């Protein structure tokens, strides 16, 4: 009788151990998928801004007008909202809805907005102020 009780207890202990192991295994968080490699910034691509013909003291550096993958965590500069692939805001000289020196104009947007106040700062269709995005 005592031996049967020991066998039953051992089997019960094994079942509990297996159930606990399955429960712990289910709790494990799977590893996230590997991140894709960052595409390299293209080099040797000639690109002049749209208004490069204007007389301007700005020195044109082709590297400033490449895709600028490193500066755009959400994608290349061709993604929505960035009309010109400039790498730094200082090269664009425009504001939100501001057009900017090198940005292609959007006549429908300009006719509707004409200028936007964000706080006390006016962002106009003439490209005054802002962070470089039209």
UniProtKB/Swiss-Prot annotation:
Q: Name one GO cellular component term.
A: membrane
Q: Where in the cell is it found?
A: Membrane
Membrane-crossing ranges are: 4-24
Grouped into one coarse class, the protein's main location is: membrane
Q: Which UniProt keywords apply?
A: Membrane, Transmembrane, Transmembrane helix
Q: How does it sit in the membrane?
A: Single-pass membrane protein
Quote the protein name from its UniProt record.
Answer: Uncharacterized protein 034R
* Organism, scientific name: Invertebrate iridescent virus 6 (IIV-6)
């Amino acid at each position: 009788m005592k031996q049967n009780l020991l066998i039953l207890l051992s089997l019960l202990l094994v079942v509990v151990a297996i159930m606990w192991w399955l429960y712990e295994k289910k709790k494990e968080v799977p590893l996230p998928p590997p991140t894709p490699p960052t595409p390299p910034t293209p080099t040797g691509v000639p690109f002049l801004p749209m208004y490069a013909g204007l007389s301007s003291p700005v020195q044109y550096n082709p590297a400033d007008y490449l895709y600028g993958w490193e500066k755009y965590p959400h994608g290349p500069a061709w993604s929505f909202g960035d009309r010109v692939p400039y790498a730094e805001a200082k090269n664009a000289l425009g504001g939100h809805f501001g057009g900017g020196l090198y940005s292609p104009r959007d006549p429908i947007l300009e006719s509707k907005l004409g200028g936007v106040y964000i706080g006390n700062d006016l962002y106009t269709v003439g490209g005054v102020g802002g962070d470089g995005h039209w």
